[in-house]
């Protein structure tokens, strides 16, 4: 008989008559939480969208990748899998056909090595990874080769699906480490796949910008991490799972480099050819890209603990897709909204000072307005080159050529202007318009709330997105490109 739940949110113990049968449950009486799903995995809706709506998910992720990285039409089509990838030193389609044929034959025989990556194969290889986690202090791990005879015995056991007791002492850590590299090297394609190859080269070129908007030689780590997070989201599930296991192993190995003498850079030299390099290419084929690939592999090892988390805006987008809301912002708009909110406090402070000293009202207002516009213009100007950046810059220049942020402020003038939907127009109309209103009415609302309200309205007019159509989503790449013209006429998904 089921036990009744006591009041007060206690955790009762239910005894079904057996001494070993105990069930505990907690009743939550917090009314705001009733009817709300409790999600412990922050990427729950991301994974749900990936499995249930793969096309919608891929277009969402790829659109944000193109926001960070400039991908020409051919490279974008390669990333989407729409065209075949042209690689340096490739042996042509015939070699690919025979390689696929041999992989199918191996798969039929249940062979792990040389077969396409599967969850069953990962389960076998996980025995090696688990054993190496216990032996990270061995000097020269992954660099010193093991015994070839023992490696062949271990290889045959894995191919046959035999249970292996690696802790018996029959095999050495170097045998296991070398066999793991052999498994990765014999995959039909690199772990990070051929179609992602050019994107990884572009990620290595992401650099910071100086105050004047010029590109520097300092890597932009935040953008690189964000780009890798997005790129890993569209990896095949088996590749993503094994990559996570591998990078975590290499990260833990590098943490003990004082014992094993294997830094992240040394490990990158060992694994980049198996994880990043296209198959059937040599160092001469890659030429100047070798440094980029090795550096990129070392970067992934160092930051592996951050790379398998979906960006916050992707999580929010997936959550809203399933919870019924149709409004969502992109990463650029989230940054821009934050900038606008910061400026709203400056404008509010400016208005308070103007009401205290009416004699200098117009001059100080114009000065603070120009400063706010210059700050917003500089924030947008520092974005990486993209279509959205060009559209926003055109809005600034179209608003007023004589008052473009970054120039010397012109003579302050207070006059009625045509209604503008741009950020600069909204800021100037709010500041100057509110002054004229405050002179006529003494009971005007607080400047902080007014400034925040107008700037939030600006964000909604320029940045709100909507999932159009049914939840299945009629999301097309053009909607994912944030067309300004479409947003003014009608609202689209992205």
UniProtKB/Swiss-Prot annotation:
InterPro entries: ARHGAP19_RhoGAP, Rho_GTPase_activation_prot, RhoGAP_dom. The record marks 143 as: Arginine finger. Residues 399-451 are annotated as: Disordered. Residues 102-308 form the Rho-GAP domain. It comes from the Eukaryota. One of its GO terms (molecular function) is GTPase activator activity. One of its GO terms (biological process) is signal transduction. Gene3D superfamilies: Rho GTPase activation protein. The modification Phosphoserine is found at residues 7, 31, 422, 438, 470. GTPase activator for the Rho-type GTPases by converting them to an inactive GDP-bound state. This is Rho GTPase-activating protein 19.
């Amino acid at each position: 008989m089921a036990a009744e739940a006591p009041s007060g949110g206690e955790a009762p113990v239910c005894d079904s008559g057996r001494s070993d049968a105990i069930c505990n449950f907690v009743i939550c009486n917090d009314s705001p939480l009733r009817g709300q799903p409790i999600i412990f995995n922050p990427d729950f809706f991301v994974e749900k969208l990936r499995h249930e709506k793969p096309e919608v998910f891929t277009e969402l992720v790829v659109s944000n990748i193109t926001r960070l990285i400039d991908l020409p039409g051919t490279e974008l089509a390669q990333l989407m899998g729409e065209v075949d990838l042209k690689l340096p030193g490739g042996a042509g389609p015939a070699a690919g056909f025979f390689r696929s044929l041999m992989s199918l034959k191996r798969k039929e025989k249940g062979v792990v090595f040389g077969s396409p990556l599967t969850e069953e194969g990962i389960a076998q290889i996980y025995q090696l990874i688990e054993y190496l986690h216990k032996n990270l202090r061995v000097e020269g791990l992954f660099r010193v080769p093991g015994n070839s005879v023992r490696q062949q015995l271990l290889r045959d056991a894995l191919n046959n699906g035999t249970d292996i007791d690696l802790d018996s002492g029959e095999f050495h850590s170097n045998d296991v480490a070398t066999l793991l590299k052999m498994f990765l090297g014999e995959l039909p394609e690199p772990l990070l796949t051929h179609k992602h190859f050019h994107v990884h080269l572009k990620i290595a070129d992401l650099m910071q910008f100086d105050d004047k908007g010029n590109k520097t030689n300092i890597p932009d780590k935040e953008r690189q991490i964000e780009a890798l997070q997005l790129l890993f989201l569209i990896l095949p599930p088996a590749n993503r799972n094994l990559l996570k296991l591998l990078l975590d192993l290499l990260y833990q190995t590098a943490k003990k480099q004082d014992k094993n003498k294997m830094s992240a850079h040394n490990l990158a030299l060992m694994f980049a050819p198996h994880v990043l390099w296209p198959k059937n290419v040599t160092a001469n084929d890659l030429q100047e890209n070798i440094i980029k690939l090795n550096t990129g592999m070392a970067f992934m090892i160092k930051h592996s603990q951050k790379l398998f988390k979906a960006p916050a805006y992707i999580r929010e987008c997936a959550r809203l897709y399933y919870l019924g809301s149709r409004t969502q912002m992109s990463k650029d708009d989230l940054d821009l909204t934050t900038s606008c909110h910061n400026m709203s406090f400056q404008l509010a402070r400016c208005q308070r000072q103007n009401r205290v000293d009416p004699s200098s009202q117009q001059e100080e207002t114009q000065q603070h307005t120009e400063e706010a516009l210059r700050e917003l213009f500089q924030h947008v100007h520092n974005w990486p080159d993209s279509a959205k950046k060009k559209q926003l810059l055109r809005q600034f220049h179209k608003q007023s050529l004589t008052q473009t942020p970054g120039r010397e402020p012109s003579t302050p003038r207070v006059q009625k202007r045509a209604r503008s939907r741009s950020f600069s127009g909204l800021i100037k109309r709010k500041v100057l318009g509110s002054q004229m209103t405050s002179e006529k009415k003494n009971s005007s609302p607080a400047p902080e709330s007014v400034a925040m309200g107008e700037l939030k309205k600006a964000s909604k007019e320029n940045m709100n997105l909507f999932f159009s159509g049914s939840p299945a989503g009629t999301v097309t790449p053009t909607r994912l490109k944030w067309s300004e013209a479409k947003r003014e006429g009608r609202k689209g998904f992205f």
